[in-house]
């Protein structure tokens, strides 16, 4: 996997101090558990539940008493897979926290029940084949409905590996801008797969052009199965009475909240 990996765990323009937030897991060539660990604590002093509950994370928990803390807080140390649990007096439910992926082999050891050894010898003439998991739309639907940054990043890297043979968001973005997106009204400034980067800039006219391109290539019926409808996904509690006529995706670009998608009028006219 490593020879194909030609990028970093964080994207260009990501906020480095968001490393502890669930919406910014590290990217990796072979993600495990979504590169996050889930911690659950019903009340102060109770047993901390882990998901996945494996010894790698069990030994990474460091419980601390903090008399000044009302709420229980969990903070991962910035450059280490150590999670400090600051005990407070208020109940704590469930949260997810990214872990550092450089120790992935240790996670695989626990999961696969195979001892990891640093010295690796490559076998010769073994059969090689690609194993496919979920159909494409089964990945894209939760990505769009949850606005899942991790899915978006890893999907772009998988596209890069499929098209270019390497995992590099910068190389695949450059390729797409020179091919599929070469005729956009304005050349976008595109930095990553999720939109976490503060460097991303797309004009509304370019969004409309991309939506038009997708509708012509894939058809509206397929897109309706992928995009959130009114009162669904990130549109929950919005456009409730118009749920059968709107399919769209929310997004934030450099501090501006946007909504891009499709609207079907009473006269059956499709608006982008």
Kindly give the residue locations of the regions a language model identified.
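Periplasmic/cell-envelope proteins involved in peptidoglycan metabolism and beta-lactam response
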Residues: 1-68, 76-78, 87-89
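Short, glycine/proline-biased beta-turn/loop segments that scaffold the active-site neighborhood
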Residues: 3-9, 119-125, 229
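Secretory-pathway/luminal and periplasmic proteins that interact with or process carbohydrate-rich
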Residues: 6-10, 152, 235-237
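Short Gly/Pro-enriched turn/cap motifs at secondary-structure boundaries
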Residues: 19-20, 102, 249-253
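Extracytoplasmic
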Residues: 25-27, 34, 69, 78-82, ...
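A generic structural signal for nonpolar/aromatic side chains embedded in well-ordered alpha-helices
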Residues: 30, 143, 225-227
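A small/polar active-site loop signature that marks catalytic segments
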Residues: 63-222
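C-terminal soluble interaction/assembly domains
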Residues: 186-272
């Amino acid at each position: 996997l490593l020879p194909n990996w030609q990028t970093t765990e964080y994207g260009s323009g990501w906020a480095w101090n968001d490393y502890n937030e669930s919406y910014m897991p590290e990217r990796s060539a072979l993600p495990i558990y979504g590169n996050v660990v889930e911690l659950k604590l019903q009340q102060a002093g109770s047993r901390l539940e882990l998901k996945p509950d494996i010894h790698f994370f069990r030994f990474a928990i460091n419980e601390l008493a903090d008399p000044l803390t009302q709420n229980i807080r969990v903070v991962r140390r910035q450059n280490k897979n150590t999670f400090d649990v600051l005990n407070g007096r208020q109940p704590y439910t469930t949260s997810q926290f990214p872990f550092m992926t450089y120790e992935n082999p240790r996670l695989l050891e626990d999961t696969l029940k195979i001892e990891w050894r640093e010295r690796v010898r490559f076998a010769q003439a073994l059969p090689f084949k690609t194993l496919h998991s979920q159909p494409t739309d089964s990945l894209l639907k939760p990505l769009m409905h949850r606005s899942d940054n991790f899915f978006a990043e890893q999907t772009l890297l998988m596209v890069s590996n499929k098209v270019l043979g390497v995992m590099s968001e910068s190389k695949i973005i450059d390729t797409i801008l020179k091919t599929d997106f070469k005729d956009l009204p304005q050349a976008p400034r595109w930095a990553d797969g999720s939109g976490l980067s503060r460097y991303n800039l797309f004009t509304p006219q370019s969004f409309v052009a991309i939506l038009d391109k997708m509708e012509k290539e894939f058809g509206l019926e397929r897109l309706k199965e992928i995009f959130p409808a009114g009162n669904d996904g990130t549109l929950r509690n919005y456009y409730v009475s118009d749920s059968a006529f709107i399919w769209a995706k929310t997004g934030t670009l450099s501090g501006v909240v946007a909504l891009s998608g499709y609207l079907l009028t009473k006269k059956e006219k499709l608006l982008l």
